[in-house]
Design a protein with these regions (language model features):
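Catalytic histidine neighborhood in serine/cysteine hydrolases
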Residues: 78, 204-219
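N-terminal cap/lid segment of alpha/beta-hydrolase-fold proteins
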Residues: 21-45
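Bacterial N-terminal signal peptides
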Residues: 8-18
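The feature captures the conserved acid-bearing segment of alpha/beta-hydrolase catalytic domains
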Residues: 41, 156-206
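Alpha/beta-hydrolase active-site loop
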Residues: 89-110, 129
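Short, surface-exposed "cap/lid" segments of acyl-processing enzymes
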Residues: 38-75, 79-82
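Catalytic active-site module of serine/aspartate enzymes centered on a nucleophile-bearing elbow/loop
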Residues: 223-249
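Primarily recognizes the serine-hydrolase "nucleophile elbow" in alpha/beta-hydrolase
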Residues: 105-106, 114-169, 177
Length: 249
């Protein structure tokens, strides 16, 4: 009995070691939330992955609900908490480098050669800077983006005063960055109650689809409707066949 117990204990220890080692990834320091696809539909493997930049409240209800809906549609999601990442200042260049790390790892892990970016509020104001700073081999993987209630600028750092709805403009204007992105479909979804919104300023940019919803900053918590609008606006990018470009090495 004692010998059997010792053998069992040794086996359990041996089994635990690889598990601990395999859990580590090159992007663990970014504290990402992952929503892998559980679908067995073969067609889903050709859909893009999603990187979701959260609002300044962190990985909260809207971010997680919309991401879960997208995962059910066959698109695995990497959730990136703006609250965690931007609690200390990051430059646009540093943000782009960390985004590149995410693409490099999860495009291989999930075998997806295309990616769609979605940002909510603070996240929508920052991800255009990441797109415009991508090296060509990663830039070509980005096939679409959705900006949910973005304002016109960002500080690339979370300020408590932002939660008090102060109106001071951020250090980095978002509009010039979005204007540099002309080759992929973009959705800009905004609320009729928002002031200082970026979306109306993009009305003349041909690759941008503008949609307005009621319900304030979180669109009345109608997460299924938000997901539907994203899927509609980015349908060509989502359904397009995988290009010959393999995930970047």
């Amino acid at each position: 009995m004692m010998i059997r117990w010792c053998i069992t204990a040794l086996l359990l220890c041996a089994l635990q070691l690889p598990l601990s080692a395999s859990a580590a990834t090159p992007v663990d320091d970014l504290e990402l939330d992952l929503l892998p696809v559980t679908s067995v539909n073969p067609a889903d493997k050709d859909k893009p992955m999603v990187v979701f930049f959260s609002g300044d409240g962190g990985w909260a209800e809207l971010d997680s609900a919309v991401s879960a809906n997208l995962a059910k549609q066959g698109m695995p999601v990497v959730g990136w908490s703006s609250l965690t990442y931007f609690w200390s200042f990051k430059t646009p260049e540093q943000t782009a480098k960390d985004f590149q790390r995410i693409l490099a790892y999860y495009s291989k892990e999930w075998q997806r050669s295309r990616v769609i970016l979605i940002g909510y509020s603070f996240g929508a104001e920052t991800f255009p800077f990441a797109i415009t700073r991508m090296p060509p081999e990663y830039r070509k993987m980005i096939v679409g983006g959705a900006m949910l209630v973005p304002s016109i600028s960002s500080n690339f750092e979370i300020h408590v005063s932002d939660w008090l709805q102060t109106s001071a403009p951020g250090r980095y204007p978002t509009l010039p960055e979005v204007k540099k992105i002309q080759d992929i479909p973009l959705l800009c979804l905004y609320s009729e109650l928002e002031e200082g919104d970026l979306c109306p300023l993009l009305s003349k940019q041909s690759n941008v689809t503008l949609m307005q919803l009621s319900g304030g900053h979180n669109f009345g918590k109608r997460y299924a409707l938000i997901t539907k609008k994203i899927l509609q606006a980015l349908a060509p990018a989502i359904q397009a066949p995988v290009s010959q470009a393999a995930p970047a090495k």
